[in-house]
Structures are given as C-alpha cells and as structure tokens.
C-alpha cells in the first residue's frame, strides 16, 4: 500500500494548500508519519494545527505574511543539520549565523514584522481562521446555488479555504464574467494558466467588505445571465 511506502521514508514532504486546483490539507496529525515537512506558503497564518508529527514548516511570506524576498522556517532542531546539503541549503548553518549567511532582505523582513504585529492586534490565528472559514463557506455555498452554470471540481473534504476554484459550463459566459469583473474593479480572478477557470484567493488581507462586493457581483451576474 502507498501508506506503507511513505511510512518507511525518513520524511514526507507535503504542500498544505495547492493553489492551482484548490485543494487543502489541514489535519496533519491524521497522517501516519512522524517527520512531515510542510510547504505552507499559501496558507500559513490562516488556521491552527497540531505540531506533534511535524519536522519542519516553511513558507514564502508573499501571500499571507508580507512581500516577496523572505521565507519563514519553523522546525525541530534535530532536523536542522545535514552533511549532504550544500551550505545555502543547510538550515543548521543558517541558524548558526543568525540568518546572515548572506545580506538579508531588510525591507521584506521589516514588512513581515509589520504584518505579524497587525495579525496579533487583530486577534491572532483564531481571528484569521474564523475569517477564513466564514468567507470561504459563504462563497462555496453561493457558487453551489448556481450549479446550473458552474462546476466546483474539488471534493468537499479537500476544498481549499484559501483558493476557491470553479469553472463555467459555458466558456463564453466565463469570459464575460471575467471581463465584467475587471470593469467593476475585481481583479485577479483568472485561474492558473494550466487549468483555466476562475480562482478566488482569500488570503489574510482579504476583508469581509471585499467578499461582500464580490458576492454581490456574482449574484448580479447570474441574475442578469439566466437565473
């Protein structure tokens, strides 16, 4: 069985939120492996999780925690050093040098500090998890009510809260949806170039007011186009 194969490995690497297809994994403690490495670049800071079987978590800051140029690494000390890794890939060396193996991206680090201060002031992880659940649930329920027009190609148990993916059954209607959204100042709804469709990204900076505006547009569009 596949599970027996990965249990025998030294570690198991996962991406917690797959942004192209809108698939998310949050309950890491249900995976039967005691050394998980998780890339959380697109959903770090948006929900709480158990750390019992995690060896390392890392994330680029640019989606939820700041701007490009800096990554966040959180891990167990016993996984830091490896003789097989080049110096720039050896996290133990990075820790030993206080993240100063090279000239650090000062502004990116400063923005990360501002964002984390803001997150704490807003109520911390609990606030952003509640917001993520509220916003994503609202939009999924709304889109499911327009099942005559759109398809959500993700199983309920693996739907991403960060990236809502759906496709129109009518390609011309999809193009019209994107054009009119842009005219109303709603940008970045195009799906990944390899998949097409629509992608709604609900990162930590997205407010309820933004979701309200998008939701109103969705209702108005489908009312004007057949429902």
Segments the model singles out, each with a brief description of its role:
Residues 1-6:
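Short, small-residue-biased leader/transition segments that mark boundaries at the very start
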Residues 11-15, 37, 58, 72-74:
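Structural motif
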Residues 23-52:
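Catalytic PLP-binding core of fold-type I/II PLP enzymes
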Residues 61-140:
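Active-site C-terminal subdomain of aminotransferase-like
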Residues 149-153, 185-191:
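A short linear hydrophobic-aromatic micro-motif
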Residues 150-180:
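Conserved PLP-binding catalytic core of the aspartate aminotransferase-like
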Residues 176-183, 213-219:
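Short amphipathic alpha-helices in soluble, non-transmembrane regions
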Residues 192, 196-227:
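PLP-dependent enzyme catalytic core of the Aspartate aminotransferase-like
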């Amino acid at each position: 069985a596949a599970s027996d194969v990965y249990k025998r490995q030294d570690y198991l690497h996962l991406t917690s939120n797959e942004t192209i297809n809108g698939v998310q994994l949050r309950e890491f403690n249900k995976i039967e492996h005691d050394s998980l490495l998780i890339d959380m670049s697109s959903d770090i800071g948006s929900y709480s999780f158990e750390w019992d079987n995690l060896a390392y978590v890392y994330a680029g800051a640019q989606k939820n925690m700041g701007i490009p140029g800096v990554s966040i690494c959180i891990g167990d000390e016993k996984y830091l050093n490896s003789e097989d890794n080049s110096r720039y890939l050896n996290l133990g060396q990075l820790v030993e040098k206080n993240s100063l193996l090279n000239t650090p991206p000062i502004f990116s680090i400063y923005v990360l500090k501002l964002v984390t201060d803001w997150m704490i002031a807003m109520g911390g992880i609990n606030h952003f998890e509640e917001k993520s659940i509220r916003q994503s649930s609202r939009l999924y329920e709304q889109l499911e009510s327009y099942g005559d027009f759109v398809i959500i190609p993700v199983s309920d148990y693996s739907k991403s809260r960060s990236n809502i993916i759906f496709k129109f059954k009518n390609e011309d209607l999809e193009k019209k949806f994107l054009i009119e959204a842009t005219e109303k100042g709603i940008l970045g709804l195009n799906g990944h170039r390899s998949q097409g469709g629509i992608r709604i990204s609900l990162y930590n900076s997205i407010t309820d007011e933004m979701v309200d505006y998008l939701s109103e547009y969705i209702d108005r569009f489908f009312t004007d186009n057949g429902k």
